[in-house]
Swiss-Prot record:
CDD domains: acetolactate_decarboxylase (cd17299). This is Alpha-acetolactate decarboxylase. Pathway: Polyol metabolism; (R,R)-butane-2,3-diol biosynthesis; (R,R)-butane-2,3-diol from pyruvate: step 2/3. InterPro entries: Acetolactate_a_deCO2ase (IPR005128). GO terms for biological process: acetoin biosynthetic process. Disulfide bonds: none annotated. Its EC number is 4.1.1.5. Disruption phenotype: Slower growth in media containing valine, leucine plus isoleucine, or leucine plus valine. It comes from Streptococcus thermophilus. It is an enzyme of class 4 (lyase). It catalyses: (2S)-2-acetolactate + H(+) = (R)-acetoin + CO2. The gene is aldC. Keywords: Acetoin biosynthesis, Decarboxylase, Lyase. Transmembrane segments: none annotated. The keyword Lyase applies.
């Protein structure tokens, strides 16, 4: 019997929406649980991209994108990683928008109530990303998101990594696709807003189990009061 593929998620997007931005898990510990994934860094300082077992930070700095490899000692308030194992692999040979490609990916799903890991390596006619800016906990995530820098670039090669989440888990994560991008030359990346792919290889991986961890030593998290309805609306708006 093969070993179960576990999606490891630390904390929830709902906690971020409530302003719990302090990092409480190291990147080194995170990478023990998977080689592909995403999240954010301490104080929501940019976008975390995990590709091939390495962690990168993409953020907007003085009007331009900055991508750096993250130290194992850096901490995250929220992240999700998985030991990605492609179950479906197909080649995209012609131009498609993000929505068209997402529909094609979903045509391979054998149900709608399981998580999936997503990896799209290719050449993109257009890529549009944003980065959440570093912030203090007294500003709601949805409000921070209204001033996040966005960047667009044409004719770029790179990899999209992400997680597809079933609707019933909205709040724990964001329902549907949550995707981050990093260029092959490590000069561009961020949270994917939209894109046009020219060609590439798409991989869809199964997830058998959800390993949901919580910041059990963080008193701010332990005693936080969450408005669930508002939290879900904020996730939809911000993500």
């Amino acid at each position: 019997m093969s070993e179960a593929i576990k999606l490891f998620q630390y904390n929830t997007l709902g906690a971020l929406m409530a302003g719990l931005y302090g990092g409480t898990l190291t990147v080194g510990e995170l990478l023990e649980h998977g080689d592909l994934g995403l999240g954010t860094l301490d104080s929501i300082d940019g976008e975390l991209i995990v590709l091939d077992g390495k962690a990168y930070q993409a953020k907007g700095s003085e009007g331009k994108v900055e991508v750096v490899e993250v130290s194992p000692d850096e901490k995250v308030p929220y992240a999700a990683v998985v030991p990605h194992q492609a179950e479906v692999i197909f080649r995209q040979r012609y131009e498609m928008t993000d929505k068209e490609l997402e529909d094609r990916i979903e045509s391979y799903y054998d149900g709608v109530n399981l998580f999936r890991s997503i990896k799209i390596k290719g050449h993109f006619k257009h890529m549009h990303v944003r980065m959440i800016p570093k912030s203090n906990a007294d500003i709601k995530f949805a409000d921070v998101a209204t001033r996040q820098p966005e960047y667009e670039v044409d004719d770029i090669s790179g990899t999209i990594v992400g997680i597809w989440t079933p609707e019933m888990f909205h709040g724990v994560s964001v329902a549907g696709y949550h995707l981050h991008f990093i260029s092959d030359d490590l000069t561009f990346g961020g949270h994917v807003m939209d894109f046009v792919i020219e060609n590439g290889i798409i991989e869809v991986g199964p997830v058998d189990q959800l390993d949901q961890r919580f910041p059990v030593q963080d008193r701010q998290y332990l005693f936080a009061k969450f408005n669930v309805d508002e939290m879900r609306k904020d996730i939809t708006k911000a993500e």
